[in-house]
Amino acid sequence: MIVPLTSVSPAPRIDILLPAKERFSPSNAGAISGVVRDLVQASRAAKQFRIIGTAVKTSLMPEHFTGLLPKMRWLNGHNIGLAAAYLDLIHRTGSPDLVEVHSRCHVARYLAQKRPSLNVTLYLHNDPRQMKGGRSVSERRHLLRKLAGIICVSDYIRNCFLDGLDDCGDLASKVGVARNGAHRWLKQPPTKENFILLAGRMVPEKGILECATAIAQVLPHHPGWALIIAGAKRFEESAPGSYEDKIANAIAPLKERAKMLGFIPIADMRDWQARAAISACPSLWHDPMPKAVLESLAAGCALITTRRGGIPEAAEGRALIIESPSVENFANGFDKLLGDTDFRQNLQQIAWQDFPFTDTAMAEAADQLRLQALIGSR
């Protein structure tokens, strides 16, 4: 049975501590800031949250955000500096019932050590085995013992945290999953247009170059189709030899059938996603639970993606999953999607009709895990 966080009396106060590098602002919000905004907005207990981060001029959620400057960052580093400034803040204003540290294992440990009376949870957006304070089994075992709870964005990330902790017994129940979600902004299935949308951060691990190369090979055999790339610099802005420049060179033979839009506002991205018949999320690395996958499904796109990280948790049965990412395998996948109308439209229908990955579902799962942490600490 789901017990809402709002049912607890008195209403618990929950502080969310962002990584120091995050900028909780409309123009510079990173992936974690976006998830935190969605978590709070979609929660039935939204009024109970305070978001703490590095000070910005304009906040995404002014009514919830408190900006701080990292304390003695030249000595402590930015993340511990921000945590130290946070401890000063709660010394003045009083402690929350729960403080939720996002994606910084060593910060969660620092707060738990400095203020043992604090109920500290850790919200993991990435593999903790690659993080300071979480790389070793002994470090993660310490976190498991000392923290009130650990929330993971996918089963994949949960398994990463518990790697080597088979002997932890009942403590494993402290590690839960609140799978990333996306807001479905469309009220009915959109009319699709004949183009492929390739959107995401222009970094090698996202597989944009391999995917673009594959599309450049296949698209000439499918008249009437085009390619839109969002997230890279425009052609004229791509520095020679840069990753964006390599992508631009790969798709140059397509001429007017391919466009690189550069970084675009979220409203424009939603429009492209709604119109795209096909969306590609070609991650080469073990992506924990990319929002691009969820948004593509929310928009009813025929999605092509990879069996990496937490992606299959959302994409299995709803998308064309490339088992082993390569230019050749991507090309075969696109050839299938472009050439088989029934197959493509069936994926679009499934994506639209079977979409449980809402921001509301994410917030509800996270609130349940927060409640579990609060109850366990009493």
What are these regions (language model features)?
Residues 133-134, 140-141, 145-173, 182-184:
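A short, active-site helix/loop in glycosyltransferases that binds the activated sugar's phosphate group
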Residues 302-305:
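Short hydrophobic beta-strand element within catalytic cores of glycosyltransferases
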Residues 241-267:
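Nucleotide-activated donor-binding/catalytic signature segment of Leloir-type glycosyltransferases, i.e.
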Residues 263, 271-276:
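Short alpha-helical donor nucleotide-sugar binding micro-motif in glycosyltransferases
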Residues 319-328, 335-342:
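Conserved acidic donor-binding segment of nucleotide-sugar-dependent glycosyltransferases
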Residues 101-107, 124:
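Short His-centered aromatic/hydrophobic patch
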Residues 186, 341-375:
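A charged, aromatic-enriched C-terminal amphipathic alpha-helix characteristic of glycosyltransferases
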